[in-house]
Regions:
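Metal-ion/cofactor- or nucleotide/acyl-coenzyme-handling active-site neighborhoods
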Residues: 2-262
Length: 262
């Protein structure tokens, strides 16, 4: 264990040194300054409130989404495919995956709700009043309490949402559609091209034929989830999991329907 911690410290230190030029540029860029000013308006704005983080798993097809119409909600990545049938739009939309953003650029350009994207996405998404740039990284494990600084992506956009929700002050965060299970198998983070309808998400065209995407890294995402659970607990807040049939075991489970008044 001490050796593992030592190796992780050395790796994190090396990552930090390698990130310095990029992080310095990001910190000095006027687009980031303007974005951070907008981000600060969200800090603790929803203190004491609850929110739902909507994953994109197939379980959404067995989840009564109509119940969320008057709730604070985080949508992720290509949830806009569900907007027509939802009858409402989520409070926020979050995406930090380059492949998703690049291949869905027209959709993201048309988003009018508050949009949170990685700093890397500036090459496709120029500044706009509803767009917020997050300086996210693949390495350097951490939970960012202040999202105007660096966030670790934790191998899943859900982890970015958990950091955003904490920054915004939400006291109870409820996960739905976070199935934590994929029919498509392979090496974590490997980029593949979909050969047909998508069996891993709520819509067959989510990562439909010809779409490039990266295979999930569920182990790394669990590292992030454990960090999030601890930070929320230490702050007297909670994350619970109401995913229908989900395989994630990090957070306490709750039956989705029990969260709403009859």
């Amino acid at each position: 264990m001490p050796m593992e911690k030592g190796m992780q410290f050395l790796k994190d230190s090396w990552d930090y040194v390698n990130r310095l030029p990029e992080s310095t540029l990001a910190a000095m860029h006027p687009w980031r300054w303007a974005s951070n000013r907008r981000l600060l308006k969200f800090q603790n704005q929803y203190a004491g409130q609850r929110c739902f983080i909507i994953g994109n798993g197939p379980s959404l097809k067995n989840t009564d989404m109509r119940l969320l119409k008057n709730e604070y909600t985080f949508g992720m990545n290509r949830l806009f495919l569900m907007f027509p049938e939802l009858g409402f739009k989520p409070s926020f939309l979050v995406s930090v995956n380059d492949l998703v953003i690049e291949q869905s650029i027209d959709d993201f350009l048309g988003v009018e709700i508050p949009l949170f994207v990685s700093w890397r996405a500036r090459k496709w998404l120029p500044p706009a009043e509803n767009r917020h740039y997050l300086y996210t990284t693949y390495t350097g494990r951490k939970f960012a309490r202040d999202v105007t600084r660096r966030l670790w992506e934790g191998a899943t956009v859900t982890y970015t949402c958990l950091q955003l929700a904490f920054f915004m002050g939400f006291s109870k965060v409820i996960l739905i559609g976070v199935d934590h299970s994929f029919a498509t198998k392979g090496k974590p983070n490997e980029t593949i091209v979909s050969q047909g309808d998508d069996p891993n998400h709520f819509h067959p065209k989510y990562f439909g034929k010809g779409f490039k995407w990266q295979l999930p890294d569920l182990d790394t995402s669990e590292v992030g989830y454990l960090m999030a659970r601890q930070v929320y607990q230490d702050a007297g807040r909670e994350v619970i999991d109401a995913t229908v049939g989900g395989k994630l075991t990090i957070f306490p489970k709750v039956e989705y329907g029990s969260l709403f008044d009859d």
